[in-house]
Amino acid sequence: FAPNHTYDKNTFAALKNSGINEIIDGYGIMPYEENNIKFIPQLFYKVLMLPFGIQSTQIHLNYWKQKDFDNFKNFIEKNKNKILSYDQALNKINNNYKLINLLTKKIIQIKRIIKKD
């Protein structure tokens, strides 16, 4: 992902020049396409199942203890019918969710700013 999860014209140009056209990052509740690059949103750094939408989760296994692995296993078992493959998520791209994705982005950004202070 780009520094601070921001994608400007230079970042998009660098990605395209590098042949990268799919990214797991970004804000929103549904996969989307921007500047001919497909995004699967990555909103959280912990395992969390939203009641709607599609998103990926960032996890750092190198910091996990056995309890974390056990919790993750339980999460997968509990939510296995809701978990999609990467390709299945990409096939759900629908730019009709642009407004909802934008609102999600702004809400999360504001929440993170407030949390810092």
Q: Which residues does each PLM region occupy?
A:
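Acidic beta-strand-to-loop metal/phosphate-binding motif
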Residues: 1
